[in-house]
Amino acid sequence: MSEIVVTLPDGSELEMESGSTVEDVAYEIGPGLGDDTVAGVVDGELVDKAEQLTDDCELVIVTDQSDEYLQVLRHSAAHVFAQALQRLHPEAKLAIGPPTEEGFYYDVTGVDLDADDLEAIEAEMETIIEADHDIERAERSREEAFEIYEDNPYKRDILETEAADEDPVSFYTQDDWQDLCQGPHVDSTGEIGAVELLNIAAAYWRGDEDNETLTRVYGTAFESESDLEGFLQRREEAKKRDHRKLGQELDLFSIPDVTGPGLPLYHPNGKAVLRELEDFVDQLNDDQGYEFVETPHLFRTELWKQSGHYENYVDDMFLLDVNDEEYGLKPMNCPGHATIFNQGNWSYRDLPVRYAENGKVYRKEQRGELSGLSRVWAFTIDDGHLFVERDAIEQEVNVIMDQIEEVLDTFDLDYEVALATRPEKSVGSDEIWEQAQTQLRSVLESSGMDYDIESGDGAFYGPKIDFAFEDALGRNWDGPTVQLDFNMPERFDLTYTGEDNEEHRPVMIHRALYGSYERFFMVLIEHFDGNFPTWLAPEQVRILPVSDDNIGYAKQLKNRYLDDFRVEIEDRSWTVGKKIQTAHDDRVPYMLVVGDNEEEAGTVSVRDRFEDERKDVDVETFRDHLASEVEEKRVEPDFVDE
């Protein structure tokens, strides 16, 4: 039998016989690792420990100490849910039940479920877990699989699509129950330490609104009860911080039915925050020599065909028939920027050319996937596109990486970095992709950053460096990105004249410092619980006159000393206590209480939103501090602490 080379995470290599399994490799490394093996990651794909290796590959062994273990555990918990459901409701038909970032779900039909049903199903799940049934992989012929699912159109659809080339097909069994599944799974149901069913929602088969409506049951699972309890506490805190709730309470944005789903309206408070975010990155771009451009919201589809978006992205585009000609709302800004570049005659002396645009784009997400600002139809990207010579790639990407770090550090956000490689659906040659991936890997290596490889997660036109940042609740969010593109310059025939007086092809770099304003805004709302840093807050100071007699002094303070800031006067005839509480509820960073004593002395009493207070403060002293706090973009108001 032929030999294959298996590359391990530390770079070491093992020669194994073709057909060896993941578990075989683990035992070759050591008997203890072999005993502990749960699954494997082969070339970035999570697989069963019985997966046979037939070609040279990169392999990560998964044990119960691995990051991937929880994903495997939750996949098994989804099977336990499905078994429990069918024990209690044999008429239920199963669709799909994958693990998710926070747990798992299973789409089912043929049964009406409510909260009481979930309680009973959860109790049955506990029975199955306590029984500690072995979970075993089994192979069935296609004919047998179709017989098993004679009355289940969803499993038959899977057999006819994803599993169309498989014979035999993979099943997993536990006790007397089985499910069509690629795995992997833990060894027995008893490994699942704690489960909880969370909620019920509606879903469409394949995410297509034209298909049948299914019932989606969400749940989660952990190794221990304490881990589950911690998750549930964080989940409750997340509900309190939900940006949809705070967006309404703080009058930041709305998505009314009349406008359509996924189409947010920004109120003055929300737009004030967005303008600060825009000004911040615009200044960073200006400092690095970017030129600001603007492109229309729609183009002829000829442009999208030229760019490759029509071929690769048409299902996610909004298309319009205008005078018998097809147009498309732009899902990305890059083709417009490439077209602008193509209008000029460029020399190597002109490069790099850097374009920036806060450009609105439109992507047709399924209605069921839309959620607040996190998934919308219309959103704005702080897009930057650079056209550079090949030998300038690393220098430019390093500058972009510095910009991204400055943005995330400004908001005190921890982050992780990943190199996303070629997806299955892509444009361009193998040579071009390999060159692009090598360039980005070189940048990451020289930066000294720790980074992961996300195989197959690149854009269809090139590999990318992705930043994921962590919020106050420990959740990870997709954020800034840097993408190399050797393909679009080819498609648009972009050229510049080199030092040798010959035409050359520039490299295009795509870059976003936030990712999208909508998602970044959403994360900031929840990360800060609406308590934005003073420089970002829609209302930075609220002046609270003790009585109507002090309103004139309040206006004088606002107009003479604080006219450069976002300041409001609370002039309603309320008690001071109610005025303070209202300002606190509105998350205003600073409150200035002014009564007869302050007016006579020409001072203010300063309170911050943490209910700390300083009395008899000179107005100019407060103003100067406020100016420096805003200029330095400090995360917390800190005047009272000085």
Curated annotation (Swiss-Prot):
The keyword Nucleotidyltransferase belongs to this UniProt entry's keyword annotation: no
UniProt binding sites for Zn(2+): 334, 385, 510
Keyword Metal-binding: yes
Co-factor: note: Binds 1 zinc ion per subunit.
Main localization, broad class: cytoplasm
Residue span of region Catalytic: 242-533
Assigned keywords, A-Z: Aminoacyl-tRNA synthetase, ATP-binding, Cytoplasm, Ligase, Metal-binding, Nucleotide-binding, Protein biosynthesis, RNA-binding, tRNA-binding, Zinc
Essential cofactor(s): Zn(2+)
Domain of life: Archaea
Cross-referenced InterPro entries: aa-tRNA-synt_IIb, aa-tRNA-synth_II, aa-tRNA-synth_II/BPL/LPL, Anticodon-bd, Anticodon-bd_dom_sf, Beta-grasp_dom_sf, TGS, TGS-like
Oligomeric and partner information: Homodimer.
Function: Catalyzes the attachment of threonine to tRNA(Thr) in a two-step reaction: L-threonine is first activated by ATP to form Thr-AMP and then transferred to the acceptor end of tRNA(Thr).
Similarity section: Belongs to the class-II aminoacyl-tRNA synthetase family.
Protein name in UniProt: Threonine--tRNA ligase
